[in-house]
Amino acid sequence: MFQTINEISIHPELYNQKKVLIQGWITNIRGNLKIIFVELNDGSSFKNLQCVLKKEFIDFDKIENLALGVAVEISGIFSNTPERQQFGEVLVETLEIKGNNYNTNFPIQNQEISLEVLRQMPHFRHRSRLFRVIMKLRSALFFEIHKFFRRQGFINFSAPILTSNDGEGAGEVFIVDDENKDFFNKKTTLGVTGQLHAEAYALGFKKVYTFAPTFRAERSNTRRHAAEFWMIEPEVAFFTLEQIIELAVKLLQKVIKSVIIRNKDEFIFLEKAGDKNLRKRLLQFCDSQVTQISYEKAIELLLEHQEKFEEKDLFFGCDLKTEHERFLTEEIFHMPVVIINYPKNLKAFYMHQNEDGQTVAAFDLLVPGIGELIGGSQREVRYEKLLARMNELNMNIEEFQWYLDLRKYGNPGSSGFGLGFERLLMYITGIENIRDVIPFPRTNKNILM
């Protein structure tokens, strides 16, 4: 029976002086004519297992093709080594090569290779140590989010990826069709959000959420934007703006703390590689009240520091740039912050219109290092108000009649938000580019594979 490196590293004392059988890939190799040290990784952990090959046990002539990247199966006696940095090593008794390199060197010759270089080989970069850590945390975060919603009584809802509606109204969509251009007999796009369909299902299940890929044809070439990314979108019937903000904060604090607790070694590695205060900063947020201010107040605060920004044209109704959002979180509040009641011209058509006639019941949750992490709102439930807003924006009413019809039959109102999964992973890991937290990034002018 095969063991995993993760199993052995968690409780090395249980395997001390016992025979183990491991399959994995060589990440480092060094030695001489009498002894060879091989570091092995099997994907179960970012940690490597040191394997010692001695000439008296292994025929070195039969393993002359050993090299970085080669897949092997080894058996031998494991020794726990608590006095060293590593958790233990295996004295190899048998070694069988299961997958050789084909007349070439493995592309990742240095485990400290930069993220910029790794982006050019997305099919191999998960075999580097840093990217392995990032992807393991991505998987852990994925499951913690599903666990949170399950415990909160939510139903997971699968929104369609193909849709005839632009839920954000920005027009930044990918158009889908077949060669004859008549497959659906109407304009069809990849979904920019699952929210509109989630609203329909919230009227019956009350608490629903989607967790799926989202597609936006944004030509923004920034470290925060991608054409394909994952979104978490809960929708709750009967909820007000304040209640959905409370849910958003609770979600972040719960899943971040859980991921930190369950992945201690990965965070130690990240802190050594970059932000030494990573866990301290994250846990401080998890244990704190989140400040909430109005958009109007945010503009007032930013105007006090106007000279520090590239975009100095700040006024009620302007769209906050990333530099403004980060300044609020990093220089003024030194923590994540929630901004509410945005001007309606900045937000989507479906948001509840406030009594002042100028703002909508919307919120953005901003975090240091990134800016906007979550955007949400209370939905407009009043049929005439919603219809008037759609006409004001010259929307195709016929295409959205089904959405208007939701207001006709027992609609108590609902609220929801969208959380960018990759941006959350960036915040948790301290990784600065969205291209480095997704397996195969798709961005403007870039689609490898």
Curated annotation (Swiss-Prot):
It is an enzyme of class 6 (ligase). The keyword Ligase applies. The keyword Protein biosynthesis applies. One of its GO terms (molecular function) is nucleic acid binding. HAMAP family: Asn_tRNA_synth. It comes from the Bacteria. Its EC number is 6.1.1.22. It is found in: Cytoplasm. It catalyses: tRNA(Asn) + L-asparagine + ATP = L-asparaginyl-tRNA(Asn) + AMP + diphosphate + H(+). GO terms for biological process: asparaginyl-tRNA aminoacylation. InterPro entries: Aa-tRNA-synt_II, aa-tRNA-synth_II, aa-tRNA-synth_II/BPL/LPL, Asn-tRNA-ligase, Asp/Asn-tRNA-synth_IIb, NA-bd_OB-fold, NA-bd_OB_tRNA. Keywords: Aminoacyl-tRNA synthetase, ATP-binding, Cytoplasm, Ligase, Nucleotide-binding, Protein biosynthesis. The gene is asnS. The lineage of its organism: Bacteria, Bacillati, Mycoplasmatota, Mycoplasmoidales, Metamycoplasmataceae. SUPFAM superfamilies: Class II aaRS and biotin synthetases (SSF55681), Nucleic acid-binding proteins (SSF50249). Belongs to the class-II aminoacyl-tRNA synthetase family. One of its GO terms (cellular component) is cytoplasm. This is Asparagine--tRNA ligase. Homodimer.
